[in-house]
Amino acid sequence: MIERKWFTTAEVAEMLGYGLSKTKTLVLSGEIHSIKDGRNRRILPRWVDEYVERRAREAEMEWSA
């Protein structure tokens, strides 16, 4: 069985609990890395993890300030 390597923007939105439009904005702005695959965007699981970790670090820095 082939292991899934990519997520769609809609799948990432659901994983993060964000709306689709917010997630598309994050992807198009580069906040969440992606590649263009035809008409679609594809996102590696590690890119989602990197985004979450970056947001957590930013929040921790705000709390400690």
Residue ranges of predicted features:
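Major-groove DNA-recognition helix of helix-turn-helix-type DNA-binding domains
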Residues: 15-45
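A generic structural micro-environment signature
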Residues: 7, 13, 38-41, 49, ...
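A short, Lys/Arg-enriched interface patch at domain edges and termini
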Residues: 46-65
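Intrinsic disorder/low-complexity segments enriched in polar/small residues
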Residues: 4-6, 25, 59-61
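Polyanion-binding surface elements
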Residues: 1-22, 54
